[in-house]
Amino acid sequence: MGSEPGYFGEFTVQLWTGSTDDPVRYFILRKLNIMKTSTRTLSFSLIILLGWMARGADIGFIEKFALAEDRKEALKLLIPGTPDYYYYHSLDAQLRGDGATVKKHLALWVKRHGRTAQVREIQDRQALLDYGANPDATLAHLRRELGLSFNHSRVIEGQKPKHPVALDSKLISFKAYQERAYRSGDLSGVEERGLEKLEHDKLNATRLRHLLSRLQRPDVVNLPQLIIKDLRNKYSRGFGSHNIHRQLTKAQMDELLQLEPSLINSTHYINAYLIKLAPSADTDTRFNLAERGKHLNRIHQFTGRLAPAHNSLKANAIYNLLRFQQSQGQYDRELFMEYLKLPRPVAYINPKYREVQLKRPGISDVNLNADYSRITGLPPIGPDERLVRDFFLHFFRQDADFDQYLPLVRDTYLKQAFAEAKLVSGVGDAERWYSMLSTSQVKALQERIDLDFAPANKVFYKASEAVSLKVNIKNVKKLIVRVFEINTFNFYSRNLHPVNTAINLDGLAATREQAYNYDERPLRRVERNFNFPELKKRGVYVVEFIGNGRSSRALISKGNLRVLEDTGSAGHEFRVLDEDNKACAQATLWLSGNEYKADKDGLIVVPFSNRPGRQTMVLRNGNFSALASFVHQSETYSLDAGIYVDREALVTGAQAKLVVRPVLRLNGNPISLKVLEDPRLVILSTGRDGVPTMLELPVGEIKDGEAFIHEFTVPDKLAKLQFTLKARVENLAAGNKQDLTDQGTFALNQIDKTLKLENVHLARVNGAYVLDVLGKNGEAKPDRAVSVQLKHRDFKGTHSVSLKSDPSGRVDLGALADIQWIKATGSDGATYHWEISRGRYGRVAQPSVIHAATGDTIQVALAGPLNNASKGQSYSLFEVRQGTMVGDQVKAGTFRNGFLEISDLAVGDYTLY
């Protein structure tokens, strides 16, 4: 039975709760030798087995599909166009032997969702199913998917290998790797750095979509055009389906909208654009009112272009702009009318107007609780009647009537607000205004007590600035104003939280108390200004207004203290700065009942802790104190020995030099080496016989930033060298001595442990790379087969070629432009690996974050030559706001003397690549 071609064996399968004796087909490929060098496992499966690994589990649709009597009915449950739809329809077609339908589904599947793991599974299954009809295609599929090259040379005694002695550079060109990578149908074989080098305008729809899905930075030429091309493809999932859509600069977003005006209706586009309108990352709009106003106006200007479907967003933008104007004493009637025209479920709106608006297509009620803070930084609207009423009261003081608002607002609401505005302002004929109100409304208005702070009061004061408060007062004959100065140190040290208006003032003596008598009628509401010239110094003050049984408090906080933190050998190092960023040389710091004073340089040192974590501390400068917090760290030391030995100097009997350049770190920060005690160098050498020999030497003083050198004689029959630098340091937090060690190990002459008589060596001669096949005595080994595997920097896949050594034992590899690493396999099966890109392009240790002041020139060291590449080809520099890139700043950089110099950047955050 088993000898017939295409024979399928039989076996029994165990189900969830029972068993079946029905035969199940499985298939075996015969006469196929697959080497053990696969890079990916073929992911084919039998439908009868899917999901049965977990017995009794809820496995969803797979159960319906597997057990359905009519699978066509089961397939109707799937949503067309989804991955599951294509997967199960393809699986069903394969089980029916309908290969043409499978290929049709695969084509649509890849176009819509790319070449996913499920796609590859179906492709693998189909390739195996097609083996009987087209074995060559199946074998080609296996070779491609498993990365099989079959490039090993057969060694035949007495015959020389028939391979070239030099590598053909065309085989490892960018074009050659690209052609091989494109065989997958997408760009999965291309590295991130290689994406920018592709001819983007020549990519098909699938590859273009894959490109956009992988791009992380908007530094691709004609990127908006590429995005529009992808969006217009019938399989596009729309704007926002790729991360790069959100990383476009504002200029690119504008260009995108010009190319495709309909994007203004896309929620994803709107959200992405609004983030680009945010102020600089270094601008705090709580204090910078000018920037806050500009930001609000930018949002309002953009949202004004949106369709009625986005009325909630438009209302949010207008409301927050109105609130800001109100705080500045500005009342924009046109903007207020724009807000009133947006329908929303509130009591004051004219129901007829709202009904008409909601009947229009695409219009719905404004959601007053909609939260857009993630994209605009603005809070939700919430109840808006207080702001609306304040605007009406302001306008109605001067307006002759309220007719212009009647189409939008209930007449009853307008009458009451209009009459109140006139009566409390004492404007016009009082009897006329009384007639607009009911008796109960007039009585309530007369008895109402107002002791309210005006919206236009300043929120922030400088330490030396005089304080004044505007208060709207009504129905108060006698007003008492009291001022309390809070002892900030006592309060903060006891409570460890900021002062608020709920503070208990009982027992505190007011620094000022003054009474005011007024004779206005109970209906009159008057805005009065109160000056407090005594509040011209730093401190926290509570100003309390008491009148006719009501009390209102204002909290005045003037001045601030903050710290700059560093890590030293003795602990956390703090410098205290005031609100003008001036150093406070006499400042102290209070923490957990202990007070730490500044030294003569203004530095406060806080020892490390045995209980690390975030701590709140009180900063004190004179009579003023402020709260701050920091992460109290433990005292953790680490030693990096920085050991280096030139391996080519490790020749038996020769003098070799050991270079040690240690770095001591405390909590990850470099500190002085002077705190090291008893540093010693330990040299452990191990011979071929495995017998170790140890030598321990005192090092003496180690200077910061300098290396020390130790010369030694290389022992005979050496197999391994191990160098260890050890020292001790006093751990103040733990109260003991801590041992520190670091070591470097060098394995040598490993060939002596084997029966091998030759090795393959890599060298670079006159800018070209060569492989030398040499014996143990350095003699050339000609006609040795060498399999070379090469990895290109821009592509994920490798390419293998079979070469041989020439009469001098050399294999010519050429310049190996853009090759990242080489792996060579000699005729004896030994494998060698070299990372050549590091040595070619160099390495520069760069900080991940650079801080600079405005006007400073930032220098970034370059790892290698740029080969006349332009700025855009060499680096990208973007301004970042709220985690997205908003502006291209590549023009700010200049190449000079091995550095990239960046200057003339505005305040903000930037990302350099």
Question: What role is predicted for each listed range?
Answer:
Residues T39, R55-R71, K76, G81-Y88, ...:
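N-terminal, cleavable Sec-dependent signal peptides of secreted/periplasmic/extracellular proteins
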Residues P5, F11, L15:
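Cationic, low-complexity basic patches in intrinsically disordered or flexible, solvent-exposed regions
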Residues N33-S43:
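Bacterial N-terminal signal peptides that target proteins for export
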Residues S43-G51:
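Bacterial N-terminal signal peptides
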